[in-house]
A protein has these predicted regions:
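Catalytic-domain carbohydrate-binding cleft regions of carbohydrate-active enzymes
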Residues: 1-169
Length: 169
């Protein structure tokens, strides 16, 4: 069926010393502009080849105005912890106020080998109300519900079902 979207992970220089200077300015000045320009480049290519489709581009970095390129940002490689989950609501609200309406997170958290069934379910419950519902994690702990114990899997299934019930809205 082809490609329905693109994932531009690491759309910013991950290791870029503050003292580095480029034609566009210092590293700190252009850090997020790099992701913005990458999203623009992808969107322009997407429109060239798929002119009748709205771009679907997952990007981790951007800048003011990046939403015009069909960019759907997530909060990055967030800690798989209660503190990691707690910060997601504020981040999503702030990004929404800045025009990034498709803001979301790696459901379940991304980084670390810590796993807590209760934390995972709470993150899935939060994700039901996000514009993008996407469990994703580093390889240390699988993010997909199918790899969880039977009780956690059943609870996650309820969240997925609720998500599908809400989709028409």
């Amino acid at each position: 069926q082809g490609v329905g979207g693109l994932w531009g992970d690491l759309g910013e220089p991950e290791v870029f010393p503050s003292e580095a200077v480029t034609a566009g300015g210092t590293a700190d000045e252009i850090h997020n502009v790099y992701g913005h320009n990458w999203a623009k480049l992808i969107a322009e290519g997407y429109k060239k080849d798929f002119s009748n489709q709205r771009p679907f581009i997952l990007m981790r970095a951007g800048y003011s105005g990046s939403q015009r390129f069909g960019m759907m940002p997530w909060s990055g490689d967030v800690s798989r912890s209660w503190g990691g989950l707690q910060s997601q609501m504020e981040i999503s609200l702030q990004m929404g106020m800045q025009g990034m309406s498709y803001m979301h997170s790696d459901l379940g958290g991304f980084a670390g080998d810590y796993f807590d069934n209760e934390l995972y379910i709470r993150w899935m419950q939060y994700g039901v109300f996000n514009p993008i519902f996407r469990p994703h994690a580093h390889e240390d702990v699988a993010a997909e519900p199918v790899y969880k114990d039977i009780v956690t899997k059943a609870k996650a299934k309820k969240q997925v079902e609720l998500r599908y019930q809400l989709m028409p809205y």
